[in-house]
Amino acid sequence: MSASEAQVIARALFDSLTGTALQALRAAASVNGELTPERVLAALPEDAPREIRNLVMALGREGNLDRLPAVVTAFEQMTRRGGARPLTGEVISAVELNPQQRERITAQLTARYGPDLELRFSVDESLIGGLIIRIGDQVLDTSLRTRMAAIQRNMMTS
């Protein structure tokens, strides 16, 4: 089997499983009136995945069945992205970046990490200059504060 054939089969499986789960979640969220685990479970299709039933029971135990519509919305967004979680990142600068700088940094980082990258920009004047970029568990620190600390460490050890 070629890689492209495997990709087609995997996509069909993913679409089928997420479609079934989404249909069950929508049915659960459509219950009107008093929300009890029993009423919500009764609204589920017979072929609803066990995980959806377990979710309903867990939300019911915690008194959070009213959060089902938010879960449906989040699940719909995830399935539109193919199940991938959005990658989050933070760009910290010593001074406020202008819109052109933000756009350039965003373009470079999304080219490297993908279009689902969600960036947050903030300012930390103690950096003196440069940037700190955190994406996932990766950190790129080009700040003057860090460079000066490295120089100081080198001077102390020599």
Curated annotation (Swiss-Prot):
Superkingdom assignment: Bacteria
* Function, in words: F(1)F(0) ATP synthase produces ATP from ADP in the presence of a proton or sodium gradient. F-type ATPases consist of two structural domains, F(1) containing the extramembraneous catalytic core and F(0) containing the membrane proton channel, linked together by a central stalk and a peripheral stalk. During catalysis, ATP synthesis in the catalytic domain of F(1) is coupled via a rotary mechanism of the central stalk subunits to proton translocation. This protein is part of the stalk that links CF(0) to CF(1). It either transmits conformational changes from CF(0) to CF(1) or is implicated in proton conduction.
Q: Which residues form a coiled coil?
A: none
Organism name: Roseiflexus sp. (strain RS-1)
Question: A Gene Ontology molecular-function term?
Answer: proton-transporting ATP synthase activity, rotational mechanism
Subunit comment for this entry?
Answer: F-type ATPases have 2 components, F(1) - the catalytic core - and F(0) - the membrane proton channel. F(1) has five subunits: alpha(3), beta(3), gamma(1), delta(1), epsilon(1). F(0) has three main subunits: a(1), b(2) and c(10-14). The alpha and beta chains form an alternating ring which encloses part of the gamma chain. F(1) is attached to F(0) by a central stalk formed by the gamma and epsilon chains, while a peripheral stalk is formed by the delta and b chains.
Q: Which UniProt keywords apply?
A: ATP synthesis, Cell membrane, CF(1), Hydrogen ion transport, Ion transport, Membrane, Transport
Gene of this entry: atpH
Q: Where in the cell is it found?
A: Cell membrane
- GO annotations of cellular component type: plasma membrane; proton-transporting ATP synthase complex
Q: Which family does it belong to?
A: Belongs to the ATPase delta chain family.
UniProt protein name: ATP synthase subunit delta
The record's annotation in NCBIfam families points to: ATP_synt_delta
Q: What is its main location?
A: membrane
Q: Give the residue spans that cross the bilayer.
A: none
Query: What is this entry's stated membrane topology?
Result: Peripheral membrane protein
